[in-house]
Amino acid sequence: MTKNIHDVAYELQKAIAENDDFKTLKESYAAVQADAASKNLFDEFRTMQLSLQQKMMQGQEITEEDNQQAQEVVVRIQQDAKITKLMETEQRLNVVIGDVNKIIMKPLEELYSAQQQV
């Protein structure tokens, strides 16, 4: 009997929510949100990040001023232990999710590489 792919996806969602790195990420995010200075800096970082992504997606040039502002925010971020912990934990979780994505995409990869060998 074939498993419903959506059921498997919901199982994966639950597994991610139960993952230790995800739990640590939630705790780290709550710590950032509870500290006004950290929250303001994190919000500033996210706004800047989204603005730069939007510019790139629209084909707009990232100016030297944009780069300078981004560097200044990054320096301040690195000095905030709460945000640093949040970002390190998020990076670990992103590695796990990337690994899972590779596993999920393996059938397509095999299909297309088999087609190229024909």
From Swiss-Prot:
The protein, known as: UPF0342 protein BA_0863/GBAA_0863/BAS0820
Family designation: Belongs to the UPF0342 family.
Pfam families: Com_YlbF (PF06133)
Transmembrane regions listed in the UniProt entry: none
InterPro entries registered for this protein in UniProt: Com_YlbF, YheA/YmcA-like_dom_sf
